[in-house]
Amino acid sequence: MRLHLERIEEIKPEKLLNLLEICLRLRMEDPSLKLTDAFRLFDGFYEGFPGLTIDFYAQTLLITEHDPRRATQPGLHDDIARFYVENLPELNGVLLKRRASKAAGERKGIMIFGERPSTSVAENGVNYALDLQLNQDASFYPDTRNLRLWLHQNLSGASVLNCFAY
């Protein structure tokens, strides 16, 4: 699939918040998410706001800005953080990553709400340690949940080489 992002239009915050509300409601109704505390809340590439993803890791919200042209909208990240803080009572931190930033700290993430990100997640009875600020990505991919479940069910007790590291 090829994504064409040549022209980025400014989106009105109310339109984005409406998209976030719809996606949050759908995620909360998804029974497969009851067995995990790490999942994607919003995938802008597919849900109407290319260049923005929002993930939930235990009690931390991770906002990832993939396209620097989205950074021109002042206050947008604050609006996003406020929306989720109001709608997810268990949330105690919001981390913002700007993938294209020249500043390493922004690529690895800055806290815009709370003091520190979560350091572990649980999924299908397995606990995973994580450091959300170690790299420019999260180092744990919620979208591969079904693959991890399959590996757990089919390769229990086997030695597995992790070829997903870089």
Spans of model-derived segments:
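A short interface-forming secondary-structure element
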Residues: L62-Q73
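Non-catalytic accessory regions of SAM-dependent methyltransferases
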Residues: M1-A58, H66
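Conserved class I S-adenosyl-L-methionine
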Residues: S156-Y166
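Short beta-strand/turn micro-motifs composed of small residues
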Residues: E65, R98, F164
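Non-catalytic substrate-recognition/targeting regions of SAM-dependent transferases
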Residues: E47-G48, L52-D55, A71, L76-R145, ...
